[in-house]
Amino acid sequence: MKQIKVISIFGTRPEAIKMAPLVRRLNENKNVESKVCVTAQHRQMLDQVLNLFDINPDFDLNIMKTKQTLTGITARVLEGLDKIFADENPDIVLVHGDTTTTFAAALAAFYKKIAVGHVEAGLRTYNKYFPFPEEMNRKLTGAVADLHFAPTLGSKKNLLREAVNEKNIFITGNTVVDAMNHTVEKDYVFENDELNKLDYKNKKVIMVTAHRRENWGKGIENICTALRRIAEENEDVEIVYLVHLNPVVKDVVYNNLNGMKGVHLLPPLDTKETHNLMNKCFMVMTDSGGLQEEAPHLGKPVLVLRDVTERPEAVEAGTVKLVGTDIKKIVDEAYKIMKDEEEYEKMSKAINPYGDGKASDRIVDAILYHFGVLKDRPDEFSPKK
Protein backbone atom coordinates (compact mmCIF):
# COMPACT_ATOMS: atom_id res chain seq x y z
CA MET A 1 0.00 0.00 0.00
CA LYS A 2 1.18 3.52 -0.87
CA GLN A 3 2.50 5.54 2.06
CA ILE A 4 0.44 8.49 3.27
CA LYS A 5 2.41 11.66 2.57
CA VAL A 6 2.14 14.06 5.52
CA ILE A 7 3.66 17.55 5.70
CA SER A 8 3.74 19.05 9.21
CA ILE A 9 3.98 22.85 9.17
CA PHE A 10 4.86 25.19 12.04
CA GLY A 11 6.69 28.45 12.59
CA THR A 12 6.93 29.40 16.27
CA ARG A 13 8.47 27.84 19.36
CA PRO A 14 5.17 26.87 21.06
CA GLU A 15 4.01 25.14 17.88
CA ALA A 16 7.33 23.34 17.51
CA ILE A 17 7.26 22.06 21.12
CA LYS A 18 3.83 20.57 20.58
CA MET A 19 4.46 19.25 17.07
CA ALA A 20 7.87 17.69 17.81
CA PRO A 21 6.60 14.51 19.54
CA LEU A 22 4.04 14.07 16.76
CA VAL A 23 6.71 14.46 14.06
CA ARG A 24 8.78 11.79 15.82
CA ARG A 25 5.83 9.37 15.82
CA LEU A 26 5.09 10.08 12.15
CA ASN A 27 8.75 9.47 11.26
CA GLU A 28 8.62 6.09 13.01
CA ASN A 29 5.50 4.85 11.21
CA LYS A 30 6.08 2.68 8.14
CA ASN A 31 2.73 3.71 6.62
CA VAL A 32 3.69 7.38 6.58
CA GLU A 33 6.06 9.47 4.48
CA SER A 34 6.66 12.36 6.87
CA LYS A 35 8.04 15.76 5.89
CA VAL A 36 8.45 18.94 7.90
CA CYS A 37 8.15 22.53 6.72
CA VAL A 38 9.00 25.43 9.01
CA THR A 39 8.07 29.02 8.23
CA ALA A 40 10.40 30.41 10.93
CA GLN A 41 7.86 33.04 11.97
CA HIS A 42 10.08 33.20 15.12
CA ARG A 43 13.54 32.15 13.91
CA GLN A 44 15.81 31.92 16.96
CA MET A 45 13.24 30.44 19.37
CA LEU A 46 12.14 27.88 16.76
CA ASP A 47 15.68 26.64 16.10
CA GLN A 48 16.20 25.85 19.80
CA VAL A 49 13.30 23.38 19.72
CA LEU A 50 14.34 21.79 16.42
CA ASN A 51 17.77 21.09 17.91
CA LEU A 52 16.35 19.73 21.18
CA PHE A 53 14.10 17.21 19.44
CA ASP A 54 16.58 16.51 16.63
CA ILE A 55 14.22 17.58 13.85
CA ASN A 56 15.71 18.53 10.48
CA PRO A 57 13.12 20.38 8.38
CA ASP A 58 12.74 19.37 4.74
CA PHE A 59 11.61 22.89 3.87
CA ASP A 60 12.39 26.23 5.52
CA LEU A 61 10.52 29.30 4.29
CA ASN A 62 12.57 31.56 6.60
CA ILE A 63 9.97 34.33 6.44
CA MET A 64 10.93 36.26 9.60
CA LYS A 65 11.61 39.97 9.13
CA THR A 66 12.10 42.78 11.63
CA LYS A 67 8.86 44.62 12.41
CA GLN A 68 6.90 41.98 10.52
CA THR A 69 3.15 42.48 10.22
CA LEU A 70 0.41 39.87 10.35
CA THR A 71 -0.40 40.68 6.72
CA GLY A 72 3.23 40.21 5.72
CA ILE A 73 3.52 36.86 7.53
CA THR A 74 0.31 35.60 5.91
CA ALA A 75 1.35 36.67 2.41
CA ARG A 76 4.84 35.16 2.66
CA VAL A 77 3.54 31.84 4.04
CA LEU A 78 0.87 31.57 1.31
CA GLU A 79 3.41 32.33 -1.39
CA GLY A 80 6.10 29.99 -0.03
CA LEU A 81 3.77 27.03 0.46
CA ASP A 82 2.15 27.35 -2.95
CA LYS A 83 5.24 25.98 -4.70
CA ILE A 84 5.98 23.32 -2.04
CA PHE A 85 2.43 21.96 -2.24
CA ALA A 86 2.54 21.95 -6.05
CA ASP A 87 5.83 19.99 -6.04
CA GLU A 88 5.06 17.61 -3.15
CA ASN A 89 1.29 17.06 -3.49
CA PRO A 90 0.85 15.70 0.07
CA ASP A 91 -2.17 13.67 1.14
CA ILE A 92 -2.59 15.77 4.26
CA VAL A 93 -1.07 18.87 5.84
CA LEU A 94 -0.86 19.13 9.64
CA VAL A 95 -0.98 22.52 11.35
CA HIS A 96 -1.07 23.38 15.02
CA GLY A 97 -3.09 25.69 17.19
CA ASP A 98 -3.65 29.33 16.41
CA THR A 99 -0.65 31.18 14.97
CA THR A 100 -0.67 33.16 11.75
CA THR A 101 1.44 30.37 10.22
CA THR A 102 -1.33 27.92 11.17
CA PHE A 103 -4.09 29.85 9.44
CA ALA A 104 -2.03 30.73 6.35
CA ALA A 105 -0.82 27.13 5.91
CA ALA A 106 -4.36 25.77 6.24
CA LEU A 107 -5.59 28.28 3.66
CA ALA A 108 -2.73 27.43 1.27
CA ALA A 109 -3.62 23.72 1.54
CA PHE A 110 -7.31 24.48 0.95
CA TYR A 111 -6.43 26.39 -2.23
CA LYS A 112 -4.70 23.21 -3.50
CA LYS A 113 -7.57 20.95 -2.31
CA ILE A 114 -5.21 19.18 0.13
CA ALA A 115 -6.68 17.74 3.35
CA VAL A 116 -5.90 19.68 6.54
CA GLY A 117 -5.44 18.14 10.00
CA HIS A 118 -5.71 20.67 12.84
CA VAL A 119 -3.77 19.71 15.97
CA GLU A 120 -5.11 21.38 19.16
CA ALA A 121 -8.44 22.12 17.50
CA GLY A 122 -11.54 23.62 19.06
CA LEU A 123 -10.13 26.08 21.60
CA ARG A 124 -12.37 29.17 21.85
CA THR A 125 -12.90 32.34 23.86
CA TYR A 126 -15.73 33.54 21.56
CA ASN A 127 -14.22 37.03 21.51
CA LYS A 128 -12.48 37.63 18.21
CA TYR A 129 -10.04 40.18 19.65
CA PHE A 130 -9.06 38.19 22.78
CA PRO A 131 -6.58 36.74 22.19
CA PHE A 132 -5.67 38.64 19.02
CA PRO A 133 -5.07 37.36 16.37
CA GLU A 134 -5.18 33.80 17.75
CA GLU A 135 -8.95 33.45 18.23
CA MET A 136 -9.72 34.14 14.57
CA ASN A 137 -6.66 32.19 13.37
CA ARG A 138 -7.96 29.01 15.00
CA LYS A 139 -11.61 29.57 14.02
CA LEU A 140 -10.68 30.14 10.37
CA THR A 141 -8.33 27.13 10.45
CA GLY A 142 -11.18 25.06 11.85
CA ALA A 143 -13.41 26.18 8.99
CA VAL A 144 -11.09 24.62 6.38
CA ALA A 145 -9.79 21.63 8.40
CA ASP A 146 -10.86 18.09 7.49
CA LEU A 147 -9.62 16.36 10.67
CA HIS A 148 -9.88 18.06 14.05
CA PHE A 149 -7.59 16.77 16.82
CA ALA A 150 -9.28 18.23 19.90
CA PRO A 151 -7.22 18.02 23.10
CA THR A 152 -10.26 17.80 25.40
CA LEU A 153 -13.98 17.03 25.45
CA GLY A 154 -14.66 20.75 25.91
CA SER A 155 -12.79 21.52 22.68
CA LYS A 156 -14.82 18.85 20.88
CA LYS A 157 -18.07 20.40 22.14
CA ASN A 158 -16.99 23.79 20.77
CA LEU A 159 -16.48 22.23 17.34
CA LEU A 160 -19.83 20.42 17.45
CA ARG A 161 -21.53 23.77 18.20
CA GLU A 162 -19.94 25.05 14.98
CA ALA A 163 -21.50 22.15 13.04
CA VAL A 164 -18.27 20.20 12.51
CA ASN A 165 -19.08 16.57 11.66
CA GLU A 166 -18.47 14.46 14.78
CA LYS A 167 -16.79 11.68 12.80
CA ASN A 168 -14.01 14.13 11.89
CA ILE A 169 -13.25 15.07 15.52
CA PHE A 170 -10.83 13.02 17.63
CA ILE A 171 -10.18 13.74 21.34
CA THR A 172 -6.45 13.12 21.68
CA GLY A 173 -5.16 14.97 24.73
CA ASN A 174 -2.51 17.62 24.26
CA THR A 175 0.85 16.78 22.69
CA VAL A 176 2.63 19.14 25.10
CA VAL A 177 2.39 16.43 27.78
CA ASP A 178 4.14 14.04 25.37
CA ALA A 179 6.87 16.67 24.89
CA MET A 180 7.38 17.18 28.63
CA ASN A 181 8.06 13.49 29.15
CA HIS A 182 11.11 14.13 26.95
CA THR A 183 12.29 17.41 28.53
CA VAL A 184 11.80 17.30 32.32
CA GLU A 185 14.60 15.74 34.40
CA LYS A 186 14.58 15.13 38.16
CA ASP A 187 18.07 16.46 39.01
CA TYR A 188 18.35 18.95 36.18
CA VAL A 189 21.31 21.36 36.14
CA PHE A 190 20.50 24.62 34.33
CA GLU A 191 22.70 26.03 31.59
CA ASN A 192 21.80 29.48 32.92
CA ASP A 193 23.80 29.56 36.16
CA GLU A 194 21.61 32.25 37.72
CA LEU A 195 18.88 29.60 37.94
CA ASN A 196 21.21 27.12 39.66
CA LYS A 197 21.88 29.69 42.42
CA LEU A 198 18.21 30.03 43.42
CA ASP A 199 17.11 28.39 46.67
CA TYR A 200 14.10 26.38 45.47
CA LYS A 201 13.73 24.61 48.83
CA ASN A 202 13.51 27.59 51.18
CA LYS A 203 12.30 30.36 48.86
CA LYS A 204 9.05 30.67 46.92
CA VAL A 205 10.29 30.94 43.33
CA ILE A 206 7.61 32.46 41.10
CA MET A 207 8.04 31.94 37.37
CA VAL A 208 6.54 34.74 35.24
CA THR A 209 5.93 35.22 31.52
CA ALA A 210 3.75 37.96 30.01
CA HIS A 211 3.91 39.14 26.43
CA ARG A 212 0.52 38.82 24.68
CA ARG A 213 -0.60 41.64 22.39
CA GLU A 214 -3.75 42.33 24.38
CA ASN A 215 -1.54 43.03 27.44
CA TRP A 216 0.82 45.45 25.69
CA GLY A 217 0.94 48.85 27.37
CA LYS A 218 -1.25 49.17 30.47
CA GLY A 219 -1.53 45.41 31.03
CA ILE A 220 2.24 44.84 31.26
CA GLU A 221 2.58 48.00 33.41
CA ASN A 222 0.03 46.61 35.89
CA ILE A 223 1.68 43.18 35.97
CA CYS A 224 5.04 44.80 36.75
CA THR A 225 3.49 46.92 39.53
CA ALA A 226 1.96 43.81 41.11
CA LEU A 227 5.27 41.92 40.90
CA ARG A 228 7.12 44.87 42.43
CA ARG A 229 4.70 44.88 45.38
CA ILE A 230 5.05 41.11 45.91
CA ALA A 231 8.86 41.33 45.81
CA GLU A 232 9.01 44.32 48.19
CA GLU A 233 6.66 42.77 50.76
CA ASN A 234 8.06 39.22 50.84
CA GLU A 235 11.69 38.38 51.57
CA ASP A 236 11.07 34.67 50.99
CA VAL A 237 10.06 35.25 47.35
CA GLU A 238 12.25 35.16 44.24
CA ILE A 239 10.58 36.24 40.99
CA VAL A 240 12.02 34.92 37.73
CA TYR A 241 10.53 36.88 34.82
CA LEU A 242 11.35 35.44 31.40
CA VAL A 243 11.15 38.64 29.37
CA HIS A 244 10.05 38.48 25.73
CA LEU A 245 12.53 40.01 23.29
CA ASN A 246 9.93 42.31 21.71
CA PRO A 247 10.87 45.90 22.73
CA VAL A 248 7.17 46.69 23.35
CA VAL A 249 7.36 44.25 26.27
CA LYS A 250 11.04 44.31 27.19
CA ASP A 251 11.36 48.09 27.60
CA VAL A 252 8.37 48.32 29.96
CA VAL A 253 9.54 45.39 32.11
CA TYR A 254 13.11 46.66 32.44
CA ASN A 255 11.96 50.22 33.20
CA ASN A 256 9.79 48.91 36.04
CA LEU A 257 11.69 45.96 37.53
CA ASN A 258 15.37 46.06 36.59
CA GLY A 259 17.69 45.99 39.61
CA MET A 260 14.99 45.11 42.14
CA LYS A 261 15.96 42.81 45.02
CA GLY A 262 14.42 39.38 44.58
CA VAL A 263 13.60 39.91 40.88
CA HIS A 264 15.55 38.16 38.13
CA LEU A 265 14.94 39.37 34.57
CA LEU A 266 16.09 36.76 32.07
CA PRO A 267 15.67 36.39 28.32
CA PRO A 268 13.35 33.60 27.14
CA LEU A 269 14.86 30.21 27.96
CA ASP A 270 14.98 27.27 25.63
CA THR A 271 12.29 24.63 26.05
CA LYS A 272 14.24 22.29 28.30
CA GLU A 273 15.31 25.10 30.66
CA THR A 274 11.74 26.46 30.75
CA HIS A 275 10.15 23.11 31.55
CA ASN A 276 12.69 22.34 34.27
CA LEU A 277 12.34 25.80 35.85
CA MET A 278 8.60 25.18 35.93
CA ASN A 279 9.23 21.84 37.58
CA LYS A 280 11.34 23.41 40.35
CA CYS A 281 9.37 26.63 40.94
CA PHE A 282 6.65 27.27 43.54
CA MET A 283 4.01 28.72 41.21
CA VAL A 284 3.55 30.26 37.76
CA MET A 285 2.11 33.59 36.59
CA THR A 286 1.57 33.82 32.85
CA ASP A 287 -0.52 35.02 29.93
CA SER A 288 0.80 32.14 27.83
CA GLY A 289 -1.57 29.49 26.55
CA GLY A 290 1.00 26.70 26.60
CA LEU A 291 2.04 27.23 30.22
CA GLN A 292 -1.58 26.80 31.31
CA GLU A 293 -1.31 23.23 30.01
CA GLU A 294 2.26 22.50 31.01
CA ALA A 295 2.18 23.62 34.66
CA PRO A 296 -0.76 21.38 35.70
CA HIS A 297 1.19 18.36 34.42
CA LEU A 298 3.91 19.29 36.95
CA GLY A 299 1.49 20.11 39.77
CA LYS A 300 2.15 23.87 39.79
CA PRO A 301 -0.59 26.42 40.57
CA VAL A 302 -1.05 29.00 37.81
CA LEU A 303 -2.37 32.55 37.87
CA VAL A 304 -3.41 33.49 34.34
CA LEU A 305 -2.76 37.16 33.57
CA ARG A 306 -5.71 37.40 31.19
CA ASP A 307 -9.43 38.09 31.51
CA VAL A 308 -10.49 35.14 29.36
CA THR A 309 -8.95 31.79 28.50
CA GLU A 310 -9.57 29.26 25.75
CA ARG A 311 -8.44 26.59 28.21
CA PRO A 312 -11.31 26.46 30.73
CA GLU A 313 -10.58 22.83 31.67
CA ALA A 314 -7.73 23.81 33.99
CA VAL A 315 -9.89 26.50 35.62
CA GLU A 316 -12.63 23.90 36.17
CA ALA A 317 -10.10 21.38 37.49
CA GLY A 318 -8.85 23.99 39.97
CA THR A 319 -5.19 24.17 38.96
CA VAL A 320 -5.52 27.55 37.20
CA LYS A 321 -7.09 30.88 38.22
CA LEU A 322 -7.92 33.81 35.94
CA VAL A 323 -6.75 37.09 37.48
CA GLY A 324 -6.44 39.42 34.48
CA THR A 325 -4.13 42.42 34.84
CA ASP A 326 -5.77 44.12 37.81
CA ILE A 327 -2.98 44.89 40.30
CA LYS A 328 -4.98 44.15 43.45
CA LYS A 329 -6.38 40.90 42.10
CA ILE A 330 -2.94 39.63 41.04
CA VAL A 331 -1.45 40.41 44.48
CA ASP A 332 -4.43 39.05 46.44
CA GLU A 333 -4.59 35.76 44.54
CA ALA A 334 -0.80 35.32 44.70
CA TYR A 335 -0.88 35.82 48.48
CA LYS A 336 -3.70 33.30 48.82
CA ILE A 337 -1.52 30.64 47.18
CA MET A 338 1.65 31.74 48.99
CA LYS A 339 0.19 31.94 52.49
CA ASP A 340 -2.60 29.32 52.53
CA GLU A 341 -1.18 25.79 52.44
CA GLU A 342 -4.61 24.30 51.86
CA GLU A 343 -5.16 26.51 48.80
CA TYR A 344 -1.73 25.59 47.41
CA GLU A 345 -2.36 21.90 48.01
CA LYS A 346 -5.76 22.08 46.32
CA MET A 347 -4.36 23.72 43.18
CA SER A 348 -1.19 21.62 42.94
CA LYS A 349 -2.97 18.29 43.38
CA ALA A 350 -5.73 18.92 40.82
CA ILE A 351 -6.20 16.38 38.02
CA ASN A 352 -4.37 17.35 34.81
CA PRO A 353 -7.16 17.65 32.22
CA TYR A 354 -4.82 17.96 29.24
CA GLY A 355 -3.14 14.67 28.54
CA ASP A 356 -1.48 11.40 29.45
CA GLY A 357 1.54 11.46 27.14
CA LYS A 358 -0.14 9.49 24.32
CA ALA A 359 -1.68 12.29 22.24
CA SER A 360 0.79 11.88 19.36
CA ASP A 361 0.01 8.16 19.08
CA ARG A 362 -3.72 8.92 18.95
CA ILE A 363 -3.22 11.52 16.20
CA VAL A 364 -1.15 9.15 14.06
CA ASP A 365 -3.79 6.43 14.54
CA ALA A 366 -6.56 8.88 13.60
CA ILE A 367 -4.73 9.75 10.37
CA LEU A 368 -4.25 6.05 9.56
CA TYR A 369 -7.93 5.44 10.32
CA HIS A 370 -9.02 8.34 8.08
CA PHE A 371 -7.01 6.96 5.15
CA GLY A 372 -8.25 3.40 5.68
CA VAL A 373 -5.05 1.83 7.04
CA LEU A 374 -6.71 1.12 10.42
CA LYS A 375 -10.22 -0.33 10.48
CA ASP A 376 -11.15 0.63 14.03
CA ARG A 377 -11.57 4.20 15.21
CA PRO A 378 -8.84 4.95 17.80
CA ASP A 379 -9.69 5.25 21.51
CA GLU A 380 -10.07 8.80 22.79
CA PHE A 381 -8.35 10.59 25.67
CA SER A 382 -10.24 10.98 28.93
CA PRO A 383 -8.70 12.51 32.09
CA LYS A 384 -8.31 10.13 35.03
CA LYS A 385 -10.73 10.91 37.81
Curated annotation (Swiss-Prot):
GO terms for biological process: lipopolysaccharide biosynthetic process. It is found in: Cytoplasm. Its EC number is 5.1.3.14. It is an enzyme of class 5 (isomerase). Keywords: Cytoplasm, Isomerase, Lipopolysaccharide biosynthesis. Pfam families: Epimerase_2. It catalyses: UDP-N-acetyl-alpha-D-glucosamine = UDP-N-acetyl-alpha-D-mannosamine. GO terms for molecular function: UDP-N-acetylglucosamine 2-epimerase activity. Its main location: cytoplasm. GO terms for cellular component: cytoplasm. Belongs to the UDP-N-acetylglucosamine 2-epimerase family. This is Putative UDP-N-acetylglucosamine 2-epimerase. It comes from Clostridium acetobutylicum (strain ATCC 824 / DSM 792 / JCM 1419 / IAM 19013 / LMG 5710 / NBRC 13948 / NRRL B-527 / VKM B-1787 / 2291 / W).
